[in-house]
Amino acid sequence: AFYHRLWWPDLVLIKRDAFRFHLPTKHHLIERLSAGELPQWFPYDALGRPFIGGTHTGVFHPFTALYVLLPVPDAYRASTLISCLLGALGAFALGRMLNLSRAGALLAGIAFALAGHAVSMTDNIVYLYSLCALPLFCLGIEKTLRNRIAWAALPAVVWATVFLIGDVQTGYYYTFIALAWCWARAPGPWLNTGLRLMLIGCLAALLAGIQLGPAWAVFASSDRTQPALFHEQALHWSTHPLRVATVLASPVGEYKDLPDIGRFFFGNPQRPWSVWAESLYLGVPVAGLAFLGAWQRRDLRVLALLGTLALVLALGRYGGLYDVFYQVMPLWSAFRYPEKLMGVVSFALAMLAGAGLDSLRTGWFRPAAWIAAATVCACAWLGLHTDTAGVWAAAEFGAPAPLARSVTESAAWAFLFSAVAALGVGLAVFGARHERLRGAWPVAIIVAIATLDL
């Protein structure tokens, strides 16, 4: 229901790259294809640049068929909607594969598709699709490890489509996700697991070769081959530590002047967009259930590992580890925007939240923890709601007084909403301790609270 407007005809996505970049390039693509030729050159950007080799044009991705059949704005909306549905259904299917209950898998799908990071990516189909394909990719790897080797085609095709739509960076990250998944969940000998993973990688490379070849030619002639020159640009849009708090409490001035908020509070001085993802929100209910899931389901610790590692890397210049990878890992220095890795954090937390919900269903009741979280959030609301908080923020961050007051006020309301959500979950958990209230109702209430909170 959240994405219902994507179903409406004659609407155009106009936010950021959707309108300024993707719609014009798709128009050019369809014009060239209609003329019976592949668009080798894009003359409308500076003095011109390669079109296919630019990767993010997504010439060979299956979504291109939508642009042939529909008007460009409608095709873009349809591809955005399909990506969101793919993410939700993929997370649900992966949850069932990981032995989550239907309710747990449902919560995982909802939390992943409605997470702030995923919603923020609706302005860029390249980044949105590669994020939403991640659950299906992990599902394919799990099936390949546990069933016939023919299942290797599924993760290979998903992986290839990530390259074909143009997100080579996330496709590169998929390599590390696949390695971690196989290391943690391989049921058989390491040799057999390694061969299956190599098969997946080779198939993906063959399928995506038509895009990776031109992309490599463009990359080889760019300044991205020189890490020392590209270092500052690569670390731009690192996730500021203050932004991590918005995973639990949001919005924090998100609907005010985003460039000024990014400039004064999150260390990004460049305009017009000083934050990469407009929201990183998941909420206290999802985060709390994710912690419980990681604690109770030891077989899913790979998700906790992936989420933690991705979070530290997403900090970029503030975390230090990204710089190490930049210097050590092959090709890592070719990519930018560390905050992209927050999508992996959202994925891991969403899946673990489903496992945490199942822990409540099996009798692991700790309502006091939820009441304590609600109390902490309520105290934060009381503290940030004062004029003193606005004065302190203006002095500490050098922000104009009206902006500082606006941010602290919105943060206060965000913590109040989080307190209410945490209290609601705590009451549902408390009720589930009693025989008369056990069953589907407490679980349904918790899922509803988490959904409404998102």
State the predicted function of each range.
Residues 70-74, 147-148, 165-169, 295-299, ...:
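Transmembrane helix interruption/hinge and helix-loop junction motifs
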